[in-house]
Amino acid sequence: MDKTITFKIDGVDVKGFPGQTIMEAADAAGVYIPRLCYLKDLTPHGSCRVCTIKVDGRAQAACTQPIAEGVEVENNTAELNEKRRDIIDMFFVEGNHFCMFCEKSGNCELQAMAYRLGICAPKYPFQFPDCSLDATHPDLFIDRNRCILCGRCVNASKVIDEKSVFEFVGRGAAKKIAVNADTLAGTNMAVSD
């Protein structure tokens, strides 16, 4: 049987197993760490930074940081929650995220995270970027005004259904999600996939 590893999250002992990340061990122990890009069955990449914690005083992404014996993890602190609010706030002002007009209102992780962190109105000015829409595939439509570039669709499409439907294109401010039309040509891809 594998040796258990004991560490602390906000002063509480948490046990995990070698190879687990702090996020996985926290979930197993019932300790909530905020996240947006993390999905349980996918390799984490820490792109959203909402799960940022402090491990022995150093900022780390909980979804990618492996557990280690005796480390002290800070999660639910005023400083970290303020940074999380800033990140979520920026997601809202950089895109077309007007919850009361959205069909996903009430069933949206971004909206739920904002409420959980106490965000009632953005503190930054809206940017209203003019993001293009992608309707290059007959069964898929990407509204880039709502995309926060978390990468979940890209990773899920590669790992879970192995179709590589979506991909990142561009770099920096020009980075966006695109439908890999060449890969989909002649496939039986359907909206239900």
Where are these regions (language model features)?
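Fe-S ferredoxin-like electron-transfer domains
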Residues: 49-193
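Terminal leader/tail segments of proteins
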Residues: 1-4
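N-terminal cofactor/phosphate-binding cores enriched in small/glycine residues
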Residues: 7-69
